[in-house]
Regions:
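C-terminal transmembrane helix and the adjacent membrane-cytosol boundary/short C-terminal tail
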Residues: 14, 235-260
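Generic hydrophobic transmembrane alpha-helix motif, especially the helices
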Residues: 112-146
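Cytoplasmic-entry segments and transmembrane alpha-helices of multi-pass inner-membrane transporters
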Residues: 90-124, 153-156
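Membrane-cytosol interface at the C-terminal ends of specific transmembrane alpha-helices
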Residues: 133-184, 190-199, 250
């Protein structure tokens, strides 16, 4: 007679982990000042926002925010191009597959890790002090932002390339840089293109936030109108940004299908 196998006992991690996670989540709600009564009371004030937010002033937005939206796109394009192409050679030095020297590998890897830990908003505040308010500060901030993300994504991609062509190029007498250029670079170019489009999309969103600290773009208009509770002027700007981001995302998906 076949015996029904016993159901295995839950692991120690499950016995301890799940209750701990639930208890810690409840504790965190109280720590951040969450209060259900305050939430209900403040939620009743939502009409201060929603009544105007869903009544967009299209004419005002087209007349006053069009140039700032174009500036936002220009900031994102320039920063993405500069940041990603600066990160391209750095990524090869930050990968074990193409850089066998421990010292230089550690230096470049640490540099990319360092700039990635600094928020883009801090870069924006730093550069607005260094070069003044305006889109140039935003471009510099997003260059650092783009370089950090591309450096991480691309260096990890290089780590997983096929080393066969690289070793064959070296065996045929090519120098290290020549071997990398002829054998490793072609393998990661499709990924580089896909990452570039992804970072460009991120820069569009980030440039809106950077405008809040005076780094150019449409963010400064959004912040000004928010102060005066003119959400009817903010909502069409948000819709414009949404359309731009969706368009970039769809183009990115189409292009990735073509090249990957």
């Amino acid at each position: 007679m076949n015996k029904v196998p016993k159901k295995p006992l839950p692991s120690l991690l499950a016995v301890i982990g799940y209750p701990f996670t639930i208890a810690f989540s409840i504790f965190s709600f109280f720590q951040i000042g969450f209060n259900l009564e305050d939430f209900k009371r403040n939620f009743a004030n939502r009409r201060l926002v929603t009544d105007t937010l869903f009544n967009p002033k299209w004419d005002w937005a087209i007349e006053n925010a069009s140039q700032a939206l174009i500036e936002t796109i220009q900031i994102a394009i320039l920063a993405s191009i500069l940041g990603c192409f600066i990160a391209l050679p750095l990524s090869f030095y930050a990968s074990r597959a193409t850089n066998q020297t421990t010292t230089t590998y550690f230096i470049y890897k640490s540099f990319l890790n360092f700039i990635r830990t600094i928020p883009d908003l801090f870069w924006a505040m730093l550069f607005t002090v260094a070069v003044g308010l305006g889109p140039f500060a935003g471009v510099l901030a997003l260059v650092m932002f783009s370089m950090a993300i591309m450096g991480k994504l691309l260096s990890e991609t290089i780590d997983s390339i096929d080393l066969g062509p690289l070793e064959a190029a070296k065996a045929s007498g090519a120098k290290h840089n020549q071997a990398v250029f002829s054998s490793a670079l072609p393998q990661i170019l499709p990924n580089f293109t896909a990452y570039f489009l992804y970072i460009f999309e991120l820069c569009i969103r980030a440039s809106v936030i950077l405008g809040l600290v005076g780094a150019g773009g449409v963010g400064r208009i959004i912040e000004t109108q928010r102060i005066f509770l003119r959400f009817d002027r903010i909502s069409p700007i948000i819709i414009f940004i949404l359309v731009i981001v969706i368009g970039i995302e769809q183009f990115s998906v189409w292009l990735r299908r073509k090249i990957l």
